[in-house]
Swiss-Prot record:
Alphabetically ordered keywords of this record: DNA damage, DNA recombination, DNA repair, Metal-binding, Zinc, Zinc-finger
Domain of life: Bacteria
CDD domains attached to this UniProt entry: TOPRIM_recR (cd01025)
Family as reported in the entry's similarity comment: Belongs to the RecR family.
Entry annotated with the keyword Ubl conjugation: no
Toprim domain mapped to chain residues: 80-175
Protein name: Recombination protein RecR
Coiled-coil region: none
Function text: May play a role in DNA repair. It seems to be involved in an RecBC-independent recombinational process of DNA repair. It may act with RecF and RecO.
Keyword DNA damage: yes
Any GO MF annotation of the entry: zinc ion binding
Alphabetical GO biological process terms: DNA recombination; DNA repair
């Protein structure tokens, strides 16, 4: 089926969203145009406002509408811990755990094949933040448990070690409530390698 230029433009615009393919984008576009024009206009307005009004926190680099995000502006947070994550969505995930330290958001992970070296993801800015703050005694490396995430964590840990700073890595393994028979071998191997004594 061939669509008019404006409908095609809408479909192509929706396809930039993660997980949205051609068919899903077509259904979304037609739903907005046929059944929910007011919803489509609200969506367009919200997108425009977000694209114009949301930027990056000058300290941690997460998404915010202010110069400082709520976490960086909060003076009650622990200034001895810095949690390093790959993206803004990771900040929201870590916040759900009750973590009360500071953050630094990389722009992804190291990936030489994709041309993403230390400068591209912000490692020099991370090291400058640690040096300027001067209060961090622990840097928690909360990058994803992928090959690239592990390489990124290892690279940062090496830089921190050269400066005499402690780096820790988030644990990963068997999910709470999970059954061993359903866990993949790599995850189970990490869980066994990262085992710890039971405190009584």
């Amino acid at each position: 089926m061939s669509f008019s230029p404006l409908i095609r433009q809408l479909i192509d615009g929706l396809r930039i969203l993660p997980g949205v393919g051609q068919k899903t984008a077509q259904r979304m576009a037609l739903q907005l145009l046929e059944r929910d024009r007011s919803g489509g206009l609200r969506l367009a307005q919200a997108l425009t406002q977000a694209m114009e009004g949301v930027g990056h926190c000058r300290q941690c680099r997460t998404l915010t509408e202010q110069e400082l995000c709520p976490q960086c502006a909060d003076t009650r947070r622990d200034d001895t811990q810095l949690c390093v994550v790959e993206g803004p969505t990771d900040v929201y995930a870590v916040e759900q755990t009750g973590y009360r330290g500071r953050y630094f958001v990389l722009k992804g992970h190291l990936s030489p094949l994709d041309g993403l070296g230390p400068e591209a993801i912000g490692i020099p800015q991370l090291m400058a933040r640690i040096e300027e703050q001067g209060t961090f005694t622990e840097v928690i490396l909360a990058t994803n448990p992928t090959v690239e995430g592990e390489a990124t964590a290892h690279y940062i840990a090496q830089l921190l070690s050269e400066k005499g700073l402690a780096a820790t890595r988030i644990a990963h393994g068997v999910p709470l409530g999970g059954e061993l028979e359903l866990v993949d071998g790599g995850t189970l191997a990490h869980a066994i390698a990262g085992r710890r004594p039971i405190s009584l």
